[in-house]
């Protein structure tokens, strides 16, 4: 099935229209995923035409038959407002008895911090995403002129959905261990540009931290914040929050 950040590319032209070039330098997209999408299913994305008084627009995506795919918010920094994931994290109940995620703690930092990463146009991005940015651009759901050639920032920009790939590229070094085998899925994601955009062929550092752990009747969830820093200046360029949920029923020892 499509890993949900695929849908983020469909929002970019709409959000560029609403927010202008600032979307690429300090835009924030925050989404809660509702239903899975498999290859070949059509997905329509929707964005409010103008920001509300807090500077925020609501975003959503649905399948052709109306099945909701995601709901969320988009906004500009430096204020950003209360994002979709901010709202959801504020409502989390602390969990006392995690099983699958029992080896994790809130505040835990990645053992590989800082992890060195970059994305070249032809670079294979690992086993989880076995393709290059160039291959992605040939098949991307919705392309943008800033992904190739010259841009206001010099060279090509890393596409919004590929920022997720960049931050997952070295995730094996984090030391964040869960018990398994069990079935996990992306439940939500937020990509916040602080001093963007992130560029192809630039060196970055990643710092990871677990910012929340939670559970529902069916799942255990972790919320991992990854900061993306410029390798030279050590300045924070972007922050990504990934909420991963693991199905309790899929773990044999539950």
Write out the residue ranges for each language-model feature.
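Generic detection of short hydrophobic beta-strand segments and adjacent strand-loop junctions
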Residues: 31, 74, 117-119, 191, ...
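HotDog/MaoC-like acyl-thioester-processing domains
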Residues: 38-109, 195-254
């Amino acid at each position: 099935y499509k890993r949900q950040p695929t849908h983020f590319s469909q929002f970019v032209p709409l959000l560029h229209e609403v927010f202008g070039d600032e979307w690429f330098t300090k835009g924030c997209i925050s989404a809660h995923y509702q239903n899975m999408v498999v290859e070949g299913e059509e997905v329509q994305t929707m964005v409010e035409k103008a920001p509300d008084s807090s500077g925020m627009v609501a975003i959503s995506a649905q399948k052709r038959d109306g099945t909701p795919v995601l709901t969320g918010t988009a906004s500009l920094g430096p204020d950003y407002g209360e994002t979709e994931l901010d709202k959801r994290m504020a409502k989390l109940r602390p969990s006392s008895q995690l099983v699958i995620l029992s080896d994790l703690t809130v505040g835990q930092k990645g053992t590989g911090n800082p992890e060195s990463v970059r994305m070249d146009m032809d670079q294979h991005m690992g086993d989880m995403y076995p393709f290059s940015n160039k291959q992605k651009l040939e098949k991307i759901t919705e392309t943008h002129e800033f992904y190739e050639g010259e841009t206001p920032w010099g060279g090509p920009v890393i596409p919004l959905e590929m920022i997720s790939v960049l931050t997952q590229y070295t995730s094996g070094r984090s030391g964040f261990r869960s018990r398994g085998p069990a079935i996990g899925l992306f439940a939500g994601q937020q990509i916040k540009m602080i001093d963007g955009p992130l560029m192809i062929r630039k060196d970055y550092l990643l710092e990871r931290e677990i910012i929340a752990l939670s559970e529902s009747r069916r799942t255990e969830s972790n919320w991992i914040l990854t900061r993306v820093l410029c390798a030279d200046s050590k300045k924070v360029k972007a922050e990504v929050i990934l909420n991963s949920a693991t199905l309790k029923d899929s773990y044999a020892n539950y």
